[in-house]
C-alpha cells in the first residue's frame, strides 16, 4: 500500500478520510470512514509515524466545518474504534488530526477535544500570519 511504502521510505504518512454530505445525511459517515481506514491500512500492521486526518469532504474549500461535537463523534468514535480493531492498543499512539476548514477562529475549539491531536490546515496556512494564529490557538488549547 502507499502507506506502507511511505513508512518504508522513512516518511510520516497521513491517511485522510472523510465523508460526502450525502453520506453524512444518510447516516453512513461512520461506516464510510471505517471502510476508508480499513482499505488504506489493509495488510499493514505498522503504526510507526502514522497519522490519520479526518477531513469531511463536504467541508473542503467551502469555509464550512464540522462542529467540534461532530468531529469528536467521528474521530473518537469511528476512527479510533476502527484503528483499535486493527492495531489494538497501538492505535492510541496514532496522531489524529482534524482537517475540515480549520482556521484561527475555530482551531482552539477543535484542539480542546482530547481525541483531536492537531490540525491538517489548508487555506488558513497560505498566509504566515493566519497560520501562526492557528498554531497559537492550538497551543493555547493544548497547554
Task: Pin down the residues of each PLM region.
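Active-site loop-to-helix "anion-binding N-cap" substructures in soluble metabolic enzymes
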Residues: 1-143
Amino acid at each position: 500500500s502507499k502507506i506502507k511504502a511511505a513508512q518504508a521510505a522513512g516518511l510520516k504518512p497521513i491517511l485522510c478520510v472523510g465523508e460526502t454530505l450525502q453520506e453524512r445525511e444518510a447516516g453512513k459517515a461512520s461506516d464510510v470512514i471505517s471502510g476508508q481506514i480499513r482499505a488504506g491500512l489493509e495488510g499493514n500492521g505498522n503504526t510507526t509515524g502514522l497519522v490519520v486526518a479526518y477531513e469531511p469532504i463536504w467541508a473542503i474549500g467551502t469555509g464550512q466545518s464540522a462542529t467540534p461535537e461532530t468531529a469528536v463523534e467521528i474521530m473518537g468514535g469511528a476512527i479510533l474504534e476502527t484503528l483499535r480493531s486493527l492495531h489494538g492498543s497501538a492505535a492510541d499512539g496514532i496522531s489524529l488530526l482534524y482537517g475540515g476548514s480549520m482556521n484561527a477562529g475555530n482551531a482552539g475549539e477543535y484542539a480542546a477535544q482530547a481525541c483531536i491531536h492537531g490540525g491538517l490546515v489548508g487555506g488558513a496556512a497560505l498566509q504566515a500570519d493566519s497560520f501562526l494564529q492557528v498554531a497559537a490557538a492550538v497551543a493555547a488549547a493544548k497547554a
